[in-house]
Design a protein with these regions (language model features):
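RNA pseudouridine synthases
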Residues: 1-336
Length: 336
């Protein structure tokens, strides 16, 4: 969508768009602010994440908004690994390769299609027809735990916890190198520090990449605040590690971007540089498994939150998927 700025524009970009974007586009002021922060707005052909950018008459503002799904979302008989269910919510363990909700090019086979089959109309409607019950998401090729709202009151309560960053989200990942205090490559990397227990803290801002709209990029001003804490659980000859990543915030691709930023991209991550040459210390079939790992080695292993109705704190865990287990077994069997 392109907006041409007319006479006497508002003094800053966010206010100007709130005034100039047609109501028919259904873009609220808060949604426009998020689009700016995410790098989805270009001023005169150049991406800007500054909501205070000055405008003059004749400026051209391009807004990139994902197209709506134009097909009906239908129930599909897809098996679900249900960890918990009550009248207000359901907790599922999403498999690798499953998209959370329909999107352009993926109208079926999603978690939403499966949820509609299993729960029908017993899902929160706050997310709209295309995202019933969906409170948060994980990437298609990331496995692990999601909580889905069955009632609107649960949706409001859960969404508030994710917004306040009080939900506890822990991921397990397999990355290149060993991201600990002994790694000289981490010295001087902007946005990094070490906490008690050798935990690496990564603090940056994230926004959509200026040239590749499918990626996120690290910024230090103008994006959305993002914090990840990384703890090494197991390492293999200083060349591969299993790590726990704890999200303080939950931005798109956050763990993958942060691990790439600190020079420890996830094994198999084709977008953020995890497909790199395997160390000579890894040999034989193990080297082939690492080099050919088909997706980012990332699993949403633990989710904790306060039940939005009962107030009880609940925590759920999901075992590593088979492909990551096999990768770890190969590394351990390689004598590293």
């Amino acid at each position: 969508m392109t907006v041409l700025i007319g006479p006497d524009p508002a003094p800053r970009l966010d206010k100007a768009l709130a005034r100039e974007v047609p109501e028919a586009e259904s873009l609220s002021r808060s949604r426009l602010s998020r689009l700016i922060a995410e790098g989805a707005v270009a001023l005169n052909g150049k991406v800007t994440t500054d909501p205070r950018a000055k405008l003059v008459e004749g400026d051209s503002v391009e807004i990139t908004v994902q197209d709506a799904v134009d097909v009906e979302t239908t129930p599909e008989d897809i098996a679900l690994d249900i960890l918990f269910e009550d009248d207000d919510l359901v907790v599922v363990n999403k498999p690798v390769g499953m998209v959370v909700h329909p999107a352009p090019g993926t109208p079926s086979g999603t978690l939403v299609n499966a949820l509609l089959h299993h729960f029908g109309g017993n899902l929160s409607g706050i997310g709209g027809e295309k995202r019933p019950g969906i409170v948060h998401r994980i990437d298609k090729d990331t496995s692990g735990i999601l909580v889905v709202a069955k009632s609107d009151r649960a949706h409001h309560g859960l969404a508030a916890q994710f917004e306040a960053h009080s939900a506890e989200r822990h991921y397990l990942a397999i990355c290149h190198g060993v991201p600990n205090a002994a790694d000289p490559r981490l010295r001087g990397v902007k946005g990094t520090s070490f906490e008690e227990g050798g935990i690496l803290k990564v603090t940056t801002q994230l926004a959509r990449h200026k040239t590749d709209r499918q990626r996120q990029a690290v910024l230090f001003q103008g994006g959305r605040h993002a914090v990840t804490r990384v703890r090494v659980l197991e390492s293999f000859a200083e060349t591969i590690s299993m790590v726990e990543c704890r999200l303080e915030t939950g931005r798109t691709h956050q763990i993958r971007v942060h691990m790439s930023h600190v020079g420890h991209g996830l094994v198999g991550d084709q977008v953020y540089g995890g497909r790199r040459k395997v160390s000579e210390k890894v040999f034989g079939a193990t080297a082939q498994i690492i080099a050919g790992f088909p997706r980012q080695a990332l699993h949403a292993a633990s989710l904790g939150f306060e039940h939005p109705v009962s107030g009880e704190f609940m925590r759920f865990e999901a075992d590593l998927p088979e492909d990551m287990v096999e990768l770890l077994e190969a590394l351990r069997g390689n004598g590293l």
